[in-house]
């Protein structure tokens, strides 16, 4: 008899330990867990306590033992026109060789290894090699600016950095080594070694005694067996930095066992992936989707994972569909921004290739608007499934799960990412009182009750206090995990995400702290004060707009344009091009309350052409009038 999804979800909360004990059987354990969940020290939670396992074993070795010739990793680069296919046996050989290199450099369980690489197979080998030996990897998005990279080096204190000479995007080469060398010179912590993969794209200087050549060490260590190190389930597996509202980066810390179990269940129940099939996520390993659904998730499920270096429109706007046809992709994961880019091109390109293998397209990273969802669903003629989650959660928090045996499928609803997934105790709360909002269409903060399910963050790396205060201390009188997103829920239980409650904006799926951008801009000698807000953009979801008060008003329009260019260049250099505001407007004052608090939401509303609402606390009405005039020039 089929049960409703609501009943299934309720059981995952009411019979938590029994529910997750069943899911734990999806992976291999060297020693079985002694306790499913230790929630005795809220808000912390420990999953599968006492069990020992290994992410690399579950992703690679166990499949190599039974299906050595099956495809595991498919790498395609339209940037350098190369394709490589690795079987599970070949992938294990590459991972063991890299693990041997790390061990030879003195890397031990618990040591940190920072990975600053483009979308190349060696990046996946590096992550899996760290997992194999119990080192904690910290992947930083390739091409990240030196100042940002330096702050992550100081926070993670890696013994070793793995990098490459260059990445490439839309035909433009981005040299990584100068950025990395500058970051290390800026950082207080100095890694002992830098392991360099030389792609032959950009010449670089080697630092004697520090820099190591990957090809040379690979040849030296090839064929050297390195067994998996069995790790207690709650051992940290990796840290991944996410934007916060303050300048210091937040390292989301993930465990080993809970993460493996959560991914195994999600690959089956949410994505419907099957061993032997091909999964294609267009994300990057620098983001959480790349960790969960390029590297670990598909491989744990025994699928081939397609790793793509390139854009959705190079060499043409049919490139993704060509790959779906060639590699018989069954499940695809992308972002609404990528679809909006494709939407600018002829819809006939969607029909050019045989897409009969494709069962579903999942989209996440930013809100999915209805026109975009309809366009791609009509073009592909497969289900398009929105899903909402965060770096912190590690796997989808809201979506629709269509592959749970004996449980009725919840239909998709345009505009909503879906319903709470199993294991997540999701609530909407009043931000001022902490009261639970049970009625339909009430706006509240989207939160989760303790304990978070397996796969979610354990803590903030090296800063338990920040974990408790930031995530669990923002709602009055309630110790709940805040997503910092506004949401409503309709009468059928579908959640609708309304936007951020804090000052993080979402540009094409990249989460950026507005205050981080403000700090960068205010460091320019010509700028007295600045406010950055995220405004809706039809292509990127949101873009950053900066409103700066200059120390001296630019004398001419040309001078203003030159100063705007300098500010943008500064952001590029310190934070990376992804953080660059689309415009910098110069104003004589910013809209503030009489107590000096910046009226950020009013500024954002005016920038988006909306009613700014109650302005009774506004000190000087000319501030917003000035902004309106500038925007409508």
Each predicted region: which residue ranges?
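Conserved pre-ATP/AMP-binding loop-to-beta segment of ANL
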Residues: 69-71, 194-197, 201, 205-241, ...
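Structural core segment of the AMP-binding/adenylate-forming
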Residues: 128, 132-216, 335-336
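AMP-binding/adenylate-forming catalytic core of the ANL superfamily
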Residues: 140-166, 180, 325, 332, ...
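Conserved AMP-binding/adenylation subdomain of ANL enzymes
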Residues: 260-278, 288-330, 344-347
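Gly/Ser/Thr-rich phosphate-binding loop
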Residues: 296, 303, 330-334, 343-412, ...
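Conserved ANL (AMP-binding/adenylate-forming) active-site segment centered on the GW(Y/F)…HTG consensus within
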Residues: 410-414, 454-484, 501-502, 514, ...
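Conserved ATP/PPi-binding loop(s) of AMP-dependent carboxylate-activating enzymes
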Residues: 419-423, 434-472, 512, 611-612
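Conserved beta-loop-beta connector loops within the AMP-binding
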Residues: 423, 427-450, 491-492, 555-564, ...
């Amino acid at each position: 008899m089929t049960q409703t999804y609501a009943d299934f979800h309720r059981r995952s909360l009411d019979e938590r330990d029994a529910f997750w004990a069943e899911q734990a059987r999806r992976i291999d354990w060297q020693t079985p867990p002694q306790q499913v969940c230790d929630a005795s020290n809220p808000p912390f939670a420990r999953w599968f306590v006492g069990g020992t396992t290994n992410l690399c074993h579950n992703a690679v070795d166990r499949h190599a033992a039974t299906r050595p010739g099956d495809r595991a990793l498919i790498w395609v680069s339209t940037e350098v026109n190369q394709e490589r296919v690795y079987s599970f046996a070949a992938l294990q050989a590459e991972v063991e060789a890299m693990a041997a290199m790390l061990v030879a450099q003195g890397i031990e369980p618990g040591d940190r290894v920072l990975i600053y690489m483009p979308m190349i197979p060696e990046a996946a080998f590096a992550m899996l090699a760290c997992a194999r030996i119990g080192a904690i990897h910290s992947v930083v998005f390739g091409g990240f600016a030196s100042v940002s990279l330096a702050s992550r080096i100081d926070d993670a204190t890696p013994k070793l950095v793995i990098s490459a000479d260059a990445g490439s995007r839309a035909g433009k080469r981005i040299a990584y080594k100068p950025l990395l060398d500058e970051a290390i010179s800026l950082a207080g912590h100095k890694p002992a070694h830098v392991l360099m993969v030389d792609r032959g794209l950009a010449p670089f200087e080697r630092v004697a005694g520090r820099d190591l050549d990957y090809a040379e060490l690979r040849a030296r260590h090839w064929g050297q067996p390195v067994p998996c190190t069995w790790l207690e389930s709650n051992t940290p597996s990796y840290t991944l930095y996410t934007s916060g509202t303050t300048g210091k980066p937040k390292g989301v810390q993930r465990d080993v066992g809970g993460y493996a179990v959560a991914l195994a269940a999600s690959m089956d129940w949410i994505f419907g992936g099957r061993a032997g099939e091909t999964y294609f996520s267009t994300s990057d390993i620098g983001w959480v989707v790349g960790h969960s659904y390029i590297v670990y998730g598909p491989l744990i499920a025994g699928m081939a994972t397609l790793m793509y270096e390139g854009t959705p429109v190079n060499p043409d706007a049919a490139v993704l569909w060509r790959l779906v046809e060639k590699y018989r992709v069954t499940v695809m994961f992308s972002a609404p921004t990528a679809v909006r880019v494709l939407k600018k091109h002829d819809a006939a390109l969607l029909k050019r290739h045989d897409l009969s293998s494709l069962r579903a397209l999942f989209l996440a990273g930013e809100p999915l608007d209805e026109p975009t969802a309809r366009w791609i669903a009509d073009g592909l003629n497969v289900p398009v499934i929105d899903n909402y989650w965060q770096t912190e959660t590690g796997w989808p928090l809201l979506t629709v799960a269509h592959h749970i045996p004996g449980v009725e499928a919840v239909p998709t609803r345009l505009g909503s990412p879906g319903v709470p997934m199993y294991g997540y105790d999701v609530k909407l709360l009043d931000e001022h009182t902490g009261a639970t909002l049970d009625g339909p269409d009430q706006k509240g903060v989207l939160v989760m009750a303790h304990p978070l399910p397996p796969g979610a963050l354990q803590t903030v790396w090296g800063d338990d206090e920040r974990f408790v205060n930031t995530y669990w201390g923002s709602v009055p009188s309630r110790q709940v995990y805040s997503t910092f997103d506004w949401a409503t829920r309709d009468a059928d239980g579908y959640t609708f995400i309304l936007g951020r409650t804090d000052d993080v904006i979402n540009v094409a799926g990249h989460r950026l702290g507005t205050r981080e951008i403000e700090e960068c801009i205010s460091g320019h000698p010509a700028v007295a004060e600045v406010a950055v807000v995220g405004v809706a953009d039809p292509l990127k979801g949101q873009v950053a707009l900066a409103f700066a008060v200059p120390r001296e008003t630019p004398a001419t329009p040309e001078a203003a344009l030159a100063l705007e260019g300098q500010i943008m260049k500064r952001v590029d250099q310190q934070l990376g091009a992804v953080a660059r505001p689309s415009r910098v407007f110069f104003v004589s004052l910013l809209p503030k309350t009489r107590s000096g608090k910046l009226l950020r939401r009013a500024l954002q509303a005016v920038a988006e052409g909306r009613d700014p609402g109650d302005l009774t606390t506004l000190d000087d009405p000319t501030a917003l009038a000035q902004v309106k005039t500038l925007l409508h020039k």
